[in-house]
Structure formats: structure tokens, C-alpha cells
From Swiss-Prot:
The chain crosses the membrane at residues 193-213. It is found in: Peroxisome membrane. Residues 1-14 have a biased composition (Pro residues). One of its GO terms (cellular component) is peroxisomal importomer complex. This is Peroxisomal membrane protein PEX13. Belongs to the peroxin-13 family. It comes from the Eukaryota. Residues 235-300 form the SH3 domain. It is a single-pass membrane protein. Residues 1-20 are annotated as: Disordered. SMART domains: SH3.
Length: 330
């Protein structure tokens, strides 16, 4: 197939994704139908009979779109935008859960205040009854007549041989009178302190909740990075060559020049946008949509190319030459 004249680029496909900003950034799956079919892919029929993307099938019937962030052109914003897109639904769910938990917490707080107030009222009544009993007991014991009756009762029990002779002695009576008060003052044997389960549960939620959220977000970002490995060449992708100059009109599109080499996402990563392909520049710094009739697919790549960027360790080593390190050590 011969390339179209470079001085007359074809008309752009309809930008159906302009009105679909609220959909996810990448919608997997493909639709098949008429429109912008190209039979320039080598190999067996992957998207249509007789050609990879050809055979008159093309990209048609797509109904997906992009969210309000879309695909930016800045190399530094790809990771943040990708992480935001992948984690937006999770954070909305977390926000709903937090709101529900806050409502339940407010309800439990109100219930706790009501129960605590009622409990304090009951405890106050019991305390007043206890004080009344103490006052009545002191009044009864203070009366001499009741003391004589008490002594007579103890003497009668001794006479009837129901108690030992020492039961009616003054020392025994004094001990029997003071024993209840000593028990109240000293108290019974203390039981071991129990575990404060509400406090333990609070610390588990306070510490484990943020950690769990961090783990979930990390897994989502990692999954998003796995999906975009094709942009850097670390995963299977298609290589395309630009046939015309294209200037992006919004953040969802990718600008490129005539003759520039692009990486096209595989089938499962392509969004459902009719007449457009998800592609990236050669270094993977920019990702966006490109018109399908402005590029020509060269072939499929399944192996990772050599790394074009230095790792953090290499950057550190290059920043400190060997002679500087040796001089510092000496």
C-alpha cells in the first residue's frame, strides 16, 4: 500500500471522545465495524481477514471514552495522572465507607452518651441508697437500747449453748461490730485487670486502616504501571510510523511529526474510540490518541528494547567519580 501524499493529509476521524470525558481513561475491548480500515499490518488476520488490522474491518463501533484528565503531553504528569485515574473509583468507595463509618460512629457516640448518662443516674441513686443505709445503721447502733438488746441476744445464745462462752465477751462484740466496716474500707481481694478491648480495637483501626489503604493504592498503581509497559517497550506492542504531521487539539490526543516512530498499544489496552489508536512516543514519555489514518503499522514487537534511561544507582555512581570516592576514603 502506497502512502498518501504528504501535502494533503486525510480528514481526521470524528472526535467522539470529546463528549465522553467521564468514562475511564482506558476502556479495554474492541468493537468491529466499518470505518477507517487499514490493511497495512503484516501477518495473519488479527483484527480482520487478511490483515492484522485490515480486511475492511478497521476500528468501528467504539463507544468508550476518556475522563476529564485524559492523556497529557507532559512527561512528568503521566504517572500522577495514571495513578489518579486508576485509584479514583477506589477512593470514592473508600470515601463512601468513611462516611458510613462516620455516621455509625456519630450514632454510637450519641448512644454512648445516653447510656452513660442513664448509668450515672442509676449509680447516683444506688449511692444515695447506700449512704442512707449507712446513716440509718449508725443511728440504730448509736441507740443504747438497741445495744443492750444486742448484748442480751448474744448472752442468750451463749446460755442456750448455741455459741461459745467468748461470744458474749466485750472483745468479741467489739470485733464483730468493727469487722463489717473494716471489710468495706479495705475491700475484698482485687481481681486481675482485664484487657481494654475498645482501646485495642481503636489502635488497630487507627494504624491498620492507613496501612491497608496504602497497600491497596500501591497495588492499583502497580497494576496501572503493568498495563502501560507497552509504552516503554517492556511489553508486547505494535510499531507505527507517522505519515503526516498531527497537532493535538486537546489533552487526550498525542502530537507527532511526519516520519516519527510511535508505539501502538496492544488490542486489550486499546480504548473504544472509533477511528483512533492509543499510542505513545518512542521513549514512552507521552501517551495519547492518534488518528488511525495518519499512521502506518510497521510490525509487532514482543521484546523489550535496551533501556534509554539510567537507573538510580547509575545516576548516583556517575555523580561521584571513582577518584573522588577514593580521595574521600583516604
Amino acid at each position: 500500500m502506497s502512502a498518501p501524499p504528504t501535502n494533503q493529509p486525510p480528514p481526521l476521524p470524528p472526535r467522539s471522545f470529546d463528549n465522553q470525558m467521564s468514562n475511564p481513561m482506558i476502556n479495554t475491548g474492541f468493537g468491529y465495524g466499518g470505518g477507517y480500515g487499514m490493511n497495512t499490518f503484516p501477518g495473519s488476520g488479527m483484527y480482520g481477514g487478511g490483515g492484522m488490522y485490515g480486511g475492511g474491518m478497521g476500528y468501528g463501533g467504539f463507544g468508550g471514552g476518556f475522563n476529564h484528565m485524559g492523556y497529557g503531553q507532559g512527561p512528568d504528569s503521566n504517572f500522577a495522572r495514571l495513578a489518579e485515574e486508576q485509584s479514583r473509583g477506589a477512593f470514592q468507595s473508600i470515601e463512601s465507607v468513611v462516611n458510613a463509618v462516620s455516621s455509625v460512629a456519630n450514632m454510637l457516640n450519641s448512644t454512648h452518651n445516653a447510656v452513660y448518662s442513664s448509668f450515672r443516674a442509676v449509680i447516683g441513686v444506688v449511692e444515695q441508697f447506700g449512704r442512707l443505709k449507712t446513716q440509718l445503721s449508725s443511728v440504730v447502733v448509736s441507740l443504747a437500747v438497741f445495744r443492750w438488746v444486742y448484748r442480751f441476744w448474744r448472752w442468750l445464745l451463749v446460755m442456750l449453748k448455741l455459741k461459745p462462752a467468748s461470744y458474749a465477751s466485750a472483745a468479741e462484740m467489739a470485733w464483730g461490730t468493727s469487722q463489717p466496716y473494716a471489710t468495706d474500707v479495705l475491700g475484698a481481694t482485687r481481681t486481675p485487670a482485664s484487657v481494654n478491648w475498645p482501646a485495642a480495637l481503636f489502635w488497630v483501626v487507627a494504624i491498620g486502616g492507613p496501612w491497608l489503604i496504602y497497600r491497596c493504592v500501591s497495588q492499583m498503581v502497580q497494576a496501572a504501571e503493568e498495563k502501560r509497559k507497552w509504552a516503554t517497550g517492556a511489553a508486547p506492542h505494535y510499531t507505527a510510523q507517522a505519515l503526516f504531521d498531527f497537532q493535538a487539539s486537546n489533552e487526550q490526543e498525542l502530537s507527532f511529526m511526519n516520519g516519527e516512530t510511535l508505539r501502538v498499544a496492544p488490542k486489550e489496552e486499546q480504548p473504544r474510540v472509533r477511528g483512533w489508536l492509543l499510542a505513545s512516543v518512542a521513549d514512552g514519555s507521552r501517551i495519547g490518541l492518534v488518528p488511525i489514518n495518519y499512521v502506518r503499522i510497521v510490525g509487532k514487537q514482543s521484546q523489550s528494547p535496551p533501556l534509554t534511561q539510567q537507573s538510580n544507582l547509575d545516576t548516583f555512581v556517575n555523580a561521584f567519580p571513582a577518584r573522588d570516592l577514593n580521595s574521600n576514603i583516604q
